[in-house]
């Protein structure tokens, strides 16, 4: 299979994170440096971050809490733009929360995703982008 979307000489990097805000707290300076060198940087975000804590008291308001997925997505898009991501791909799973939390029982939670289906989606992204470098995490189970 040949890559018809990217020029052959374009260097490409793919970063895979679980939640919005991980792109900012884990490796943002690395992505920014590569982007500044002309590397195409793509981000896969697996969940919407629905179970994330609100650490900023100014954001701990009903209108934020009630719309947390939309707020997290807007934050992610702005953050990705500032860092230098050229593309953001949302896998669309619901945040699973912390281990043994009630959110883990939600059938749409990433923790309940069919591994073959989730892996297949990531593989198709890898095949499309054909990154030279993939940044992700070890299995934390």
Predicted regions and their residues:
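Active-site rim/loop-helix segments in enzyme catalytic domains that contact anionic ligands
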Residues: 1-129
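Gly/Ser/Thr-rich loops at beta-strand to alpha-helix junctions
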Residues: 22, 140-141
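Short, well-ordered beta-to-alpha junction loops that form the rim of enzyme active sites
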Residues: 91-94, 136-140
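Short, Asp-centered acidic motifs that coordinate Mg2+ and/or phosphate
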Residues: 133
